[in-house]
Amino acid sequence: MTVSIYLAKGRDKALRRRHPWIFSRGIDRIDGKAELGETVEIYANNGEWLARGAFSPQSQIRARVWTFDKNEAIDKDFFVRKLNQAQALRNVLAERDGLTGYRLIAAESDGLPGITIDRYQDYFVCQLLSAGAEATKELLVEALVECYPDCNIYERSDVSVRKKEGLKQRTGVLHGEEPPESVVIEENGVKISVDIVNGHKTGFYLDQRDSRERACKYVKNKSVLNCFSYTGGFGLYALKGGAKHVINADVSQLALDTAKYNAEINKFDLSKAEFLNADVFKLLREYRDNGTKFDVVIMDPPKFAESKNQLTGACRGYKDINMLAMQILNPGGTLLTYSCSGLMDAGLFQKIVADAALDAHRTVQFIERFEQAADHPLDSAYPEGFYLKGFACRVV
């Protein structure tokens, strides 16, 4: 028996605008008993069919929409169509930017709620973040194999958000071969080694690709401090852009070793690069106190806010770290600063940077804005898909 969800009166407006989420408070009743991730029919209170989606009984987002087309079944062919649509956009980007690594599926923004797929050459790395994504895993794998016969598929669903969906964390091979320790991708002429199994996220921060390329124009003949460097992404582009000297700072020695390897495979001059194992907050205070200055500071920290109750603390963290960065910049220097916290909108982040300037006793001019790379598109009906924001700031 098909399970049907009926929305409360007046709670269908967002769905009619094609927003893909149905919250628990917006539901009037459920006819039938749905299993975790089961496909359900969604109706307005008056009985009008609106959408077909996946049921998440333990989440505040009680259902996520697969389709607004009543005649569209959620089967292998559905996933094949979505993959082909997504690949069409990425083909344009891959040719334009010389990409062998990119985000193929950006969840709701590509019409597949809770599903993220990053492609590193012939390795497809999946993060399944919702009950519906988990329930349709086999169909998704079948569709990937049909679209990419020579693919290897690896799951990196080792993220805490799955707990909210009633799911355990999972990793492992779904099809093909186990990824090697290093898969080398290329973007904008830069080679990058990716550890799919143990790296952050699915192995690399693909969403910052456009920002990395745009950073090149700020660094020629400059001294650069790359904070939270991970495997050296921004630092590699700084060397590409002609930086005089680049310090990559991170707490992970393994990440720094990979950053150095990345510099080597790109044949960059290692005498211009330094790889420093350090706590960035402590390092910035040391530089401030001993008078060390830089021409450019790149500030790309991890997500400080995972939930709304962490936002206040995150604001303090972002302000403190940007204040410290401003204090170690030469007059006329450039701060490239970013936030990947989706809960923090661009306006709030700009205010935090402005407040940091006041505390640092520096005059700051915002001269450029940054967003997530084009393979992380923003669907017009899903503003929550916008999460990465950044600024280039001239610090006087």
Curated annotation (Swiss-Prot):
EC number in record: 2.1.1.191
Catalytic activity from the UniProt record: cytidine(1962) in 23S rRNA + S-adenosyl-L-methionine = 5-methylcytidine(1962) in 23S rRNA + S-adenosyl-L-homocysteine + H(+)
Presence of the UniProt keyword Chaperone in the record: no
Start and end residues of each PUA domain: 2-81
Keywords from the UniProt entry: Cytoplasm, Methyltransferase, RNA-binding, rRNA processing, S-adenosyl-L-methionine, Transferase
GO cellular component labels: cytoplasm
A Pfam family: Methyltrans_SAM
Subcellular location: Cytoplasm
GO molecular function, one term: rRNA (cytosine) methyltransferase activity
Domain of life: Bacteria
UniProt-listed InterPro entries: PUA, PUA-like_sf, PUA_sf, RLMI, RlmI-like_PUA, SAM-dep_methyl-trfase, SAM-dependent_MTases_sf
SMART domains: PUA
Stated family: Belongs to the methyltransferase superfamily. RlmI family.
Function: Specifically methylates the cytosine at position 1962 (m5C1962) of 23S rRNA.
Protein name (database record): Ribosomal RNA large subunit methyltransferase I
